């Protein structure tokens, strides 16, 4: 079983928050870090993003994502607002009530798809096909290096 999760941080020590998330998720593969502009129209600092692969089913991935956000001090004050750590389950084996899989906006987000290809060049997004074939706007996406 494999889960694909996207992590982002734009508050505080962004790298430390990402490292915490990677640790809590027990990731077996971690993409390079990318810096991206925020999505959603709210003025805020840029994000650092990574994608990880984990040996978790959908329920386990969701539970660990919530735990990582809690440990990083995530406060849900404004939708698409700034956050210490945001962890999205992009895809995972199994069903979990309340989780829409694949993530409903994954196919249009370069900060998910490009790092995903770094850890799995043959990745397939169910319902959309090979990730390498999805057209996404890479403007504003900067690869920084390893976490």
What are the roles of these predicted feature ranges?
Residues 31-48, 59-147:
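Flexible, gly/pro- and Lys/Arg-enriched active-site loops
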């Amino acid at each position: 079983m494999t889960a694909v999760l996207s992590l982002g941080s734009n508050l505080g020590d962004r790298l430390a928050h990402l490292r915490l998330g990677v640790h809590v998720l027990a990731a077996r593969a971690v993409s390079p870090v990318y810096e991206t502009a925020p999505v959603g129209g709210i003025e805020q600092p840029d994000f650092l993003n990574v994608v990880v692969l984990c040996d978790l089913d959908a329920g386990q991935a969701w539970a660990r994502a919530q735990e990582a956000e809690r440990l990083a001090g995530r406060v849900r004050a404004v939708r698409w607002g700034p956050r210490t750590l945001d962890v999205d389950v992009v895809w995972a084996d199994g069903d979990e009530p309340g989780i829409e899989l694949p993530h409903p906006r994954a196919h249009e987000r370069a900060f998910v798809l490009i790092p995903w290809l770094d850890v799995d060049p043959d990745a397939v997004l169910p319902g959309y096909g090979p990730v390498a074939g999805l057209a996404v706007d890479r403007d504003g996406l900067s690869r920084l290096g390893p976490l």
